[in-house]
Amino acid sequence: MWIEKINLKHYRNYTAIESEFSQSLNVFVGQNAQGKTNFLEAIYFLSLTRSHRTRSDKELIQFGQKELNVSGLLNRVNGKIPLEINLSNKGRTTKINYLKQPKLSDYIGTMTVVLFAPEDLQLIKGSPSLRRKFIDIDLGQIKPIYLSDLSNYNHVLKQRNAYLKSEKKVDTDFLFVLDEQLVDYGSKVIEHRLDFIQNLTKEADKYHFSISNQQEHLKISYLSSVKFDHKKNIRDNFLNLLQKNRQGDIFKKNTSVGPHRDDLAFFINQMNASFGSQGQHRSLILSLKLAEIELTKTVTGDYPILLLDDVMSELDNYRQIKLLEGIKDNVQTFITTTSLEHLQQLPKKLKLFTINQGKVLSE
């Protein structure tokens, strides 16, 4: 798939612009704080309905304005698809082919993206919430039922925690009903994640083995707060653990186990990657991103759109070349940079844009 054009109205520092893109490589050059990252963020926003940089929707709306609008024309194997998102203090509306979508899960997945940004390097040593977010974003794009199960799980989790925090005497029968619902959705979430990590590991290991000159193997492990030896045992073990921890949950007024507590661990040659070098971390994340591209193609039948936000400066010449080698000809790619000087072996077929103070000029 590839995005043919995009329109931004009152998005960050962009008042009103329309840009058309190359089907292959698009490079945005500009000094810092001119709007390069904002532009890539808008493409990400059109795909996932939210920013990867902030949880505050208000920050996305241009100062002094009440709403923003992002629209674009997507090309997929089955034809052209107009997409549109409108965001205001009343909420957001999403449209596919000019038709309003009742749920975000009906919209997300239409346009898939893989983002590689400097903050992705925190994935290995950062907090578990970063790694759960990584799973939720990537898996949610290629498996809509995952978003539905996750949303239902979070809804019941919120209910359970609110009930535990209430001053009422705990009704164990009512709590058991919540536990049953939590386990129903939570066990599905865990199973979705296990399948995803298994498939991602296969692809990522191939890339990492190549990037490391056939010296290193990569493994990703899913660390569940619910212990099990087989998928069929997840539900029963989850329910038993909730009951075992019930008094502790009542005392702490919080739910102590479930997929909202789960984590990932990365291993290079069976050693925890958190103890690895910066070079190994960069190779690992690069392998993950290339694996995401292949996995998206395998599941959806379309390559995703690749967004490289100022990461080329984070990679040495060797890893830049490996990245560009790993990008297939039919993967539309967007790169932001302050200079073309440190970019290695860029193909001749590219479209160059200059960004200055919220203005986008193509060359």
Swiss-Prot record:
It is found in: Cytoplasm. Gene3D superfamilies: P-loop containing nucleotide triphosphate hydrolases, RecF/RecN/SMC, N-terminal domain. The keyword Transmembrane does not apply. InterPro entries: DNA-binding_RecF, DNA-binding_RecF_CS, P-loop_NTPase, RecF/RecN/SMC_N, RecF_2. ATP binds at residues 30-37. Keywords: ATP-binding, Cytoplasm, DNA damage, DNA repair, DNA replication, DNA-binding, Nucleotide-binding, SOS response. GO terms for molecular function: ATP binding; single-stranded DNA binding. CDD domains: ABC_RecF. Its main location: cytoplasm. GO terms for biological process: DNA replication; DNA synthesis involved in DNA repair; double-strand break repair; SOS response. The RecF protein is involved in DNA metabolism; it is required for DNA replication and normal SOS inducibility. RecF binds preferentially to single-stranded, linear DNA. It also seems to bind ATP. PANTHER family: DNA REPLICATION AND REPAIR PROTEIN RECF. NCBIfam families: recf (TIGR00611). This is DNA replication and repair protein RecF.
